[in-house]
Amino acid sequence: MAERANLVFHNKSIDGTAMKRLISRLIDHFGMAYTAHILDQVKTLGFQQATATSISLGIDDLLTIPSKGWLVQDAEQQSLILEKHHHYGNVHAVEKLRQSIEIWYSTSEYLRQEMNPNFRMTDPYNPVHIMSFSGARGNVSQVHQLVGMRGLMSDPQGQMIDLPIQSNLREGLSLTEYIISCYGARKGVVDTAVRTSDAGYLTRRLVEVVQHIVVRRTDCGTIRGISVSPRNGRMPERIFTQILIGRVLADDIYLGSRCIATRNQDIGVGLVNRFITFRTQPIAIRTPFTCRSTSWICRLCYGRSPTHGDLVELGEAVGIIAGQSIGEPGTQLTLRTFHTGGVFTGGTAEHVRAPYNGKIKFNEGLVHPTRTRHGHPAFLCYIDLYVTIESEDSLHNVNIPPKSFLLVQNDQYVESEQVIAEIRAGASTLNFKEKVRKHIYSDSEGEMHWSTDVYHAPEFTYGNVHLLPKASRLWILSGRPYRSSVVSFSLHKDQDQTTGNSLSFEQKIYNLSMTNDQVQNKFLDPYIKKSSKKEDRSPNYSELNGMSHCNHIYPAKNSDLLAKRRKNRLIIPFQFQLSQEREKELMSLSNGISIEIPINGIFRRNSIFAYFNDPRYRTKSSGITKYETIETHSSVKKEDLIEYRGVKEFRPKYQMKVDRFFFISQEVHILPGSSSIMVRNNSIIGVDTQITLNTRSRVGGVVRVERKKKKIELKIFSGDIYFPGETDKISRHSGILIPPGKTNYKESKNIKNWLYVQRITPTKKKYFVLVRPVVTYEITDGINLATLLPQDLLQERGNVQLRVFNYILYGNGKVTRGIYDTSIQLVRTCLVLNWNQDKKDSSIEEARASFVEVRTNGIIRYFLKIGLMNRALSYIGKRNNPPLFSDDGLEYTNMNPFFSIYSKPKLQQAFNPNQGTVRMLVGKNKECQSFIILSSSNCFRMGPFTLNGVKYPKESIKKDRLILIKNSFGPLGTVLNFVNFFFFYHLITHNQILVNNYLQLDNLKQTCQVLKYQYYLMDENGIIYNPDFCSNIILNPFNLHWDFLHYNFCDETSTKMRLGQFICENICIKKNGLHLKPGQIIIVQFDSVVIRSAKPCLATPGATVHGHYGEIIYEGDTLVTFIYEKSRSGDITQGLPKVEQVLEVRSVESISMNLEKRINGWNERIKKILGIPWGFLVGAELTIAQSRISLVNKIQKVYRSQGVQIHDRHIEIIVRQITSKVLVSEDGMSNIFLPGELIGLFRAERTGRALEEAICYRTILLGITRASLNTQSFISEASFQETARVLAKAALRGRIDWLKGLKENVVLGGMIPVGTGFKGFVHRSNQHKSISIPLKIKNKNRLEGEMRDILFYHRELLDSCFLKNLGDRSKQQ
């Protein structure tokens, strides 16, 4: 008792870590038994104190940190500023996400750090504080959620949600916070369930690989070892200690000439401390890798047992212990993972702050401007940068390390504690980085524009992906887009104003086929509502006539061939009333009069100038067309019977002019040559008979089968079949048409239609007659083209004549085939161009024709010019809104076509929400054309401006009260990529003389009122030119700036502005006010500007822009794709798959890929240097040694990141099994092993020494599953998986199982060879001692060394082998 008074008393609280150290020291000093007695007393003391304390926990004990309020408020303020920057287009979505996460993460971390001091100051005996911070129950993160804030959560995919949960569990969550919280909780539940099963299966596979590894010998006699050195500084002291404790030395350790540790000595704590203190040379230790035993392990290579601290006992099943040691932490960690919504592993960067107020000075030549990862402007320094801070009385130098961001400018004044630089946190080795694609989607629809900072040529030839060389903004210009899938059908031209009743709005031009009445009523809806109240009433044709060519002329598909730069076809759509029987027939929207001009623009005499496809001469069935001719057969009267012989066609086959023709329908099937036909030739079938496996007949009749090269043509002729007698005259003829009532048959007297008689001969002697029905088409004038085209077009001008003819499209007796359900046009109504041949014009055989489209003040005129020498025919049609039409729909003018009178009432019509201006956009896809409609809701007006505080006179404002987009602009901003359209720009000028010059339009000099602005034609190259071709003034609109001047044209300017300029939000463009919305300037007027609303989107270098310039963007379309690096989540649920990938050697990540490349490279080089016999041996040894070290490090990295300590020995035993096999290659033939066979490395070495020829093999990394199926025991393999296959293979090969492992003995009910059952298996074999491989491996990082080092390390090996070969030869001699 007296001694106890002299003992030192430590009045200190003890946590879990300190308790571990105490127990470890107790075991070292007193042993296991006495330590257990001491710990029992500690336990009893703890229970007594806990009972006396009687801690209870209530909801009032959860105290919220007082500073939380202003911390959250500060974070919200930062988030609001960040949101504004994103809205302005200053930061993009990835930068916003990063910064938002970092703001809330730092707020949450600060709250977590404040927790402990707050409890200590306010309530040190708080039960929550006592329990959590003593380590008894609950960790810091759990308490932080109770009294701090829950913070950031992750969604089920593991992505961070940037909306943080600001409340804690004590305060309670709002509905939104509760739902977000459930996201993270659900992820935790799913991960726990799924990963626990994965961890269990991983444990099973690990145990399967190493279940036969048992300690069976004391020493295997190896002289090899792996070197570990504390000198390199890269290995922390803690890890160095963990690696060495419990190992056995492979070599003596010297300090100078003094030996401080001997070979085969086990290493304890004292010896490790001496190594660290003396900084000795690299230490060679024995590991399971170096053990020479093939299927077991020796005591010295394993080292100390972790249970009792002495060398492991013989017969201990260290393999099963190793498998469970690796698998069990995974199971435990998944069960006790507490999810706070994903661990934020990014960390915050370190900051350099100014020590006091002063001015910053640094060398600007050493820094480069850049953007930080949060989108802030900064300078990047590549080398060490010295920054000087000058104050009034002192100088202070700050060293900024390389690759840091400088956040201040040169000569800038900084305040004390201001952040001046950001140091990039060193890349943590435990965090895995991954590249992630982030797609930014459009939240509005409109038209895409970008600046010249984007490569306009796409990355690939036919792609729509553009790369950014530097940061720039994309703009989505507002407007309502509508898509048309038929290029040739566009009712509206560029710059038209439309109303909401138009077809573009109602149908959106998606429906390509509808009934004629529907089409007609949609066309005429705004115009004939008053006149036609009933749906079935046919419209007034005078109205239709008046508007058909005025409002609906549009270019056809071939006008979009941009290279030709000319329109060579126009279609004039119109409709007419069909009969009730054919009311439901569908017609394509492209019906109408097609005026087609050859590409070279030259017409020959009598050539077709325009044509129209009449729906009355349209059929859906296949068949034969027949015309009337004068030739007849002698046996029948002329008027009764017509026989058709071959008629020479006097025109091309599709331009026959006839008055009447006949159509004989038939069903035709074109089948592949390999088809199996279920009907015979000349057989008679009924309706819906199966012809092939997938085809049935639509009609009944006679089948005719014709086999051609690669196809079969099957025809079905419908009609009546007769077997006539010899007296029938008609039966002797075939291929004749019979008029109604003119046959000799009694049954045919009631027939009112024509018949077609065809003779069919199935055999030589038999025949029958098929009488087929005929459809007769009488070709009448139908709808006269003269009523559909303006009268002046058909009038003769000079010698030019236009005549209407009907032509049949198919030759006499030609077969017409319909594809699926498409209809066949039989007759085409054509307009033929001709001219009289006077004596003067006798040599004229050609006429030139062209379309001229002229737009002036929004009225578009088409001029059709047919030039015959000096004569010309002009057709003028004018299009605009319906009120501008005259009664007959036509306005003729003899004025100069490039001029139109300025009429205010016509131009200043009020906007309504359903009315807007159409802009036509022709993309690369010729099959799809898009519209964009701008209405007043998409634009806003700034102004009137004030100059020097003086407003403009009211008169000048009244003049232009309404905004008219139509008369003002085309595509703006950059180089135009649209062709074939004339655009109008207006110029604002304050020089009256210049205005007069511009307005000299041909012979109209100064007759027009001088206006403040005027419109000019613009060609496809984007050059504005005035129509007065005498004055050579060419203006480029993109270089012009307009000055806003006082109304009396004084010289003071207020603002300079460019048409087409993009303006960001809150940019001041006028005095005494802010500009509130972003957009593009589309109209610049004398006292105001009109800005089209636009939305900016920032894109940084390396980003990918989708879509072309000027393309229509719809809501939800992908705009930009960013690629950025993201830290992977660090919890064990993410780590387990990595462990599995390493152990299964899957080349999914860069882990195995790099390893495989290094292995292949070494195999090749070693063979070249050492030759084939020893190249394989040394190459395999080095490869296996390096890959083993790499695999152990990868697995340890995952577990250490979770704070789990697994001894390297356990992992080494597993890795030894998956790297101990080699693959016999096909390079050299061997009599023992087959190419592709897996054998053990030691077995390959022994066989190679025994044989005279070398065995060619290469190292292979087996996964744990493959290693389990490639063992020496087929019973063990069969009990793992693929039982039937393994047993059948073993039976066929006659394998023998020596029952050396645990599992096979358990399966067969024998005694397992471990523990007490081990003694029966102990045998000492001396034959292994003679097969020593004197191979030393002392350098851990072998693969980085030079080749001469490898030769140095393996000199003993080469010498011994060389001497052995010499000895063998001398014996043979």
UniProtKB/Swiss-Prot annotation:
Family: Belongs to the RNA polymerase beta' chain family. RpoC2 subfamily.
NCBIfam families: rpoC2_cyan
Keywords assigned by UniProt, alphabetized: Chloroplast, DNA-directed RNA polymerase, Metal-binding, Nucleotidyltransferase, Plastid, Transcription, Transferase, Zinc
Gene from which the chain derives: rpoC2
Residue sites binding Zn(2+) per the record: C220, C291, C298, C301
Any single Pfam family the record assigns to this protein: RNA_pol_Rpb1_5
InterPro entries: DNA-dir_RpoC2_beta_pp, RNA_pol_beta''_euk, RNA_pol_Rpb1_3_sf, RNA_pol_Rpb1_4, RNA_pol_Rpb1_5, Rpb1_funnel_sf
Gene Ontology biological-process annotations: DNA-templated transcription
Matching CDD domains: RNAP_beta'_C (cd02655)
Protein name (database record): DNA-directed RNA polymerase subunit beta''
Subcellular localization: Plastid, Chloroplast
Record field: catalytic activity: RNA(n) + a ribonucleoside 5'-triphosphate = RNA(n+1) + diphosphate
Record-level Gene Ontology MF annotations: DNA binding; DNA-directed RNA polymerase activity; zinc ion binding
